[in-house]
Swiss-Prot record:
It holds the Pfam family GTP_EFTU. GO terms for molecular function: ATP binding; GTP binding; GTPase activity; sulfate adenylyltransferase (ATP) activity. Residues 31-38 are annotated as: G1. PANTHER family: TRANSLATION FACTOR. Pathway: Sulfur metabolism; hydrogen sulfide biosynthesis; sulfite from sulfate: step 1/3. This is Sulfate adenylyltransferase subunit 1.
Length: 466
């Protein structure tokens, strides 16, 4: 196992113990066709010694049949796992890989570059902390580069690493690197990225991937691996209100009734007064049950079972929140939609809407606009075709309880499912409810809400004018 960690070979239990408390970071690679995404991931795995001997032997064999690097090992084949991908030399599905360093554990999503697979890329981006945008040094910023950057912005990814790849094909030119850097910065000025880094590299030769490049002494910055190890993805939580979506009711016997689910945001303590929606009934948290024993507190991302002091009716798909911090409740809402199916989105047609663990029906009332991903302009449109991104007004069959996606991704996201085929045809991010409640607030209430949001942003108060 010469290409794997020595510790794994010597003591697997010690290795697992060492890694169980490391910070988990999810990142994706995306860009235009043949920018070298799969090769980059293969290089990361190879140079960080995360390839087993049998994997390396298989890749050496496959390189002779499907490789594109001549006599050298084609590291892209480590990720391009589908036979159709290898034969065509492209990535089709989202491929996930796992590796770790001394500091972090990583989950990598290798997403497709071809425009017809943009919906796959959106799926891969939905859970990631960091996006690596690959740009071919020969061609600069392409249409897919713009599209993927825009989707990353819509999905709330704040940390972007722009990897200018194939620097070996432009003679490691500093001038070319600076041109691309300027072009990308100009394009993304309107996107809400809090952190954008740039690194020139050659995934094929390993320059600035894991090890520093001797071919680019003019670049003083960190390698890609160092950036992945050091970018602070633990941004301060601005939305701290409890949102617990019930996945199922756990009733193993007559003496126990618990509500199982994962905290989408906030925290819950034993003794907290909670409200179940949509019923509005109140109770007190009696126990927080886990496989490893009971807890006094559960935080965002934890899967737990809550038991209550009172027997109140709560079913799958309902939501538990704290008293005094209710979500938005509405049937009609505006959402940003990524359309993923060959058949266009049809206003008026009934679809299934899956919001968290709740399944209901609903339809698009109207398509407000769609985005031109090249100019970021909002264009008037009456239809959304495959890979289009637009603003759509929806009407759900039941009242949904949500927060705006920009505030809380856990309760602000939903998927659209075809009722006949059960195929997921779209993904949505809720912007705001469509109602007239904003006009019902007094001037004092509006001023107070604005003051609270400005002076106490950590309270997570929503904008009542939306």
């Amino acid at each position: 196992m010469s290409h794997q960690s020595d510790l794994i070979e010597e003591d697997i239990q010690a290795y697992l113990k060492q890694h169980e408390n490391k910070e988990l970071v999810r990142f994706l690679t995306c860009g235009s066709v043949d920018d070298g995404k799969s090769t980059l991931i293969g290089r990361l795995l190879h140079d960080s010694k995360m390839i087993f001997e049998d994997q390396l032997a298989a890749i050496e064999k496959d390189s002779k049949k499907s490789g594109t690097t001549g006599e050298a090992i084609d590291l892209a084949l480590l990720v391009d796992g589908l036979q159709s991908e290898r034969e065509q030399g492209i990535t089709i599905d989202v491929a996930y890989r796992y590796f770790s360093t001394d500091k972090r554990k990583f989950i990598i999503a290798d997403t497709p570059g071809h425009e017809q697979y943009t919906r796959n890329m959106a799926t891969g981006a939905s859970t990631c902390d960091i996006a690596i945008i690959l740009i071919d040094a020969r061609y600069g910023v392409q249409t897919q580069t713009r599209r993927h950057s825009f989707i990353c912005s819509l999905l709330g990814i704040k940390h972007i690493v722009v990897a200018v790849n194939k620097m070996d094909l432009v003679d490691y030119s500093q001038e070319r690197y600076q041109e691309i850097k300027k072009e990308y910065r100009e394009f993304t000025e309107s996107l809400e990225f809090s952190d954008v880094r740039f690194v020139p590299l050659s995934a094929l030769n390993g320059d600035n991937v894991v090890d520093e490049s001797v071919n680019m002494p003019w670049y003083p910055g960190a390698t890609l691996m160092k950036l992945l190890n050091t970018i602070d993805v633990k941004t301060q939580e601005q939305f701290t209100q409890l949102r617990f979506q019930v996945q199922y009711v756990n009733r193993p016997n007559l003496d126990f009734r618990g509500f199982a689910g994962t905290l989408a945001s906030g925290h819950v303590l034993v003794g907290d007064t909670i409200v179940a929606l949509p019923s509005g009934k109140e109770s007190v948290v009696k126990e927080i049950v886990t496989y490893d024993g009971n807890l006094e507190r559960a935080d965002k991302g934890m899967a737990v079972t809550l038991t209550l002091e009172d027997e109140i009716d709560i079913s799958r798909g309902e939501i538990i929140v704290k008293k005094g911090s209710l979500p938005i409740s509405a049937k009609e809402f505006s959402a940003t939609v990524v359309w993923m199916h060959e058949n266009e989105l049809e206003p008026g047609r009934e679809y299934f809407i899956k919001h968290g663990s709740k399944m209901t029906t609903g339809h698009a009332q109207n398509i407000v606009s769609k985005y031109d991903v090249n100019t970021m302009e909002s264009l008037s449109s009456s239809q959304l075709a495959i890979n289009d991104i637009g603003i759509v007004n929806f009407v759900a069959g039941e009242t949904l309880h949500f927060d705006a996606y920009e505030d809380n991704q856990g309760t602000g996201a939903f998927i659209i499912i075809d009722r006949l085929s059960n195929v997921t045809v779209g993904a949505g991010m809720i912007n705001h409810a469509i109602d007239e409640k904003a006009q019902e607030y007094s001037a004092f209430e509006l001023e107070l809400n604005a003051l609270v949001r400005k002076q106490f942003p950590h309270w997570g108060a929503r904008d009542i004018t939306k």
